[in-house]
A protein has these predicted regions:
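Active-site phosphate-binding/coordination module
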Residues: 23-117
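Short hydrophobic/aromatic-enriched beta-strand-loop microsegments
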Residues: 59-67, 80, 123, 166-167, ...
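Asp-based, Mg2+/Mn2+-dependent phosphohydrolase catalytic module
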Residues: 213, 217-218, 223-253
């Protein structure tokens, strides 16, 4: 039976500390496709960022933006942003002098903030950050991500109004979609798949929604404990050939 594999990127395909792709992981992806299986990413990264990874690993499909986008063979099937009414409520009800913000409004690693205070509070520079004084977020056609500079304790003061969130870093709460299973369902619909054909790999809390009982779920050894509890199989760490080990164990390669 042809299987359809969905891999998280960070901490699953990449090693947790160095963010490298182990040689065994690259070879496993190659062998899976050589055996006739379908391989896709399933990541919270924005579509353009995930596309770079897909090209490097020669993966033909990607569920990106936490399930808010699906791309197959270079064609974007859909790419949605966060619900704007909820974003507007968040902006209206939060003390932004205390918790500076930045938003991603384009399909690239780029974010806009209205104050220099954001870059003073956060350390990461993974996204290009432009400071536009007086920027009006309501002019954005789409908002893909909202970065909020705060600690875990301070995050209790932020009214999310049902918006999904993950921790980007210890100093940054990231508002982004966390329903990767939605993208998997879209691919299942496109190819008329059964639940028995789906295999998902992950390590983080934003992978929980795609660890469904009807699918084959593999957690990395370095994964979060709640995810491991949902998994049908726990493999070795990402930096200990965990992807290869699981695929060999089940005879997929």
């Amino acid at each position: 039976m042809r299987k359809y594999f969905f891999f998280d990127i960070d901490g699953t395909l990449t090693t947790p500390l160095t963010a490298d792709y182990p040689d065994s992981t690259r070879e496993t992806i190659r062998q899976l496709q050589a055996q006739g299986h379908f391989v896709s990413l399933a990541t919270g990264r924005i579509q353009a960022d995930a596309t770079e990874v897909a090209r490097e690993l020669e993966i033909p499909a990607l569920v990106s933006d936490g399930g808010n986008a699906v791309t197959v063979e270079g064609e974007i099937l859909y790419h949605e942003g966060l619900p704007l009414p909820l974003c507007y409520r968040l902006f209206a009800d939060t003390d932004w002098k205390k918790h500076p913000w930045a938003i991603t409004t384009e399909n690239r690693k780029y974010r806009i903030t209205s104050t220099a205070g954001y870059l003073e509070k956060v350390k990461d520079r993974y996204y290009e950050t432009e400071i536009i004084p007086g920027y009006d977020y309501r002019k954005a056609e789409k908002i893909y991500k909202i970065f909020i500079a705060c600690t875990r304790k301070e995050s209790e003061e932020i009214p999310l109004h049902g918006l999904p969130s993950v921790w980007f870093r210890e100093d940054t709460l990231l508002i982004e979609p966390v329903h990767k299973e939605r993208g998997i369902f879209e691919i299942m619909k496109k190819y008329h798949l059964t639940d028995e054909q789906i295999v998902v790999f992950g390590d983080g809390m934003n992978d929980c929604s795609m660890f469904r009982k009807e699918w084959m779920t593999v957690a990395m050894g370095n994964g979060k404990a709640p995810l491991k509890e949902k998994a049908k199989y726990i493999t070795k760490n990402a930096d200990e050939d965990g992807i290869y080990e699981a695929c060999r164990h089940f005879g997929w390669i």
